[in-house]
From Swiss-Prot:
Involved in the degradation of D-xylose. Catalyzes the hydrolysis of D-xylonolactone to D-xylonate. Its cofactor is Fe(2+). It is an enzyme of class 3 (hydrolase). InterPro entries: 6-blade_b-propeller_TolB-like, SGL, SMP-30. One of its GO terms (biological process) is L-ascorbic acid biosynthetic process. It comes from Caulobacter vibrioides (strain ATCC 19089 / CIP 103742 / CB 15) (Caulobacter crescentus). Its EC number is 3.1.1.110. This is D-xylonolactone lactonase.
Amino acid sequence: MTAQVTCVWDLKATLGEGPIWHGDTLWFVDIKQRKIHNYHPATGERFSFDAPDQVTFLAPIVGATGFVVGLKTGIHRFHPATGFSLLLEVEDAALNNRPNDATVDAQGRLWFGTMHDGEENNSGSLYRMDLTGVARMDRDICITNGPCVSPDGKTFYHTDTLEKTIYAFDLAEDGLLSNKRVFVQFALGDDVYPDGSVVDSEGYLWTALWGGFGAVRFSPQGDAVTRIELPAPNVTKPCFGGPDLKTLYFTTARKGLSDETLAQYPLAGGVFAVPVDVAGQPQHEVRLV
């Protein structure tokens, strides 16, 4: 697919991640720089906020301002004016795990994964947080990534990046997962890894490619049908934005790139916008009460 690609913020993020569309603006993080960023497409304004630790995702809250965010120390509440407050600690600090990617389903449940911060073992898990508490839904994961839900709410997707595998699950109305199966298995002999994902309004999965200079759109059957090329090697996650949800925004990363590669791809670590024909799903909000 020959796409119109625009770098909307040449941020040079070390590890740009977690983009969401909220309040007609784009929010995302730089995990390693401990930053939360906010881009206003209508005006071009940009704002940045410091986090006290590695910050990995944001999710808006039903009936409230601010966000639920993942920090290395656990799940926190964040407001730009008042800062951070701890909601819950997820795992024992001795594991050296941290939250990674997250999504919110139509019922307001927060789904998030944890991973070993050094990317050295499979100590990560997948969790679901709702009004009843936090439940572990899957475990023994190397790098948790790409949680997202189909438009009908019946299929849940989740990726283990180091295993190069996107999994699908049946998702019940009560939030239980079953029938775990391989949705897409990436080739094991190269350096392209599936990273974050998002599902569009037709039920097709857009997956960012770490080491792959772009993203791929997969059909509900797992067939690759479209590819977008970006001028950055490590693409981390897409999200839909714009007034009609027909703009795909992508975060990227400079992490792991040599000086030679960075000189060849100076926009690595930037945020990119690409118009698409099929709209995304609205950003859901976390239900805390």
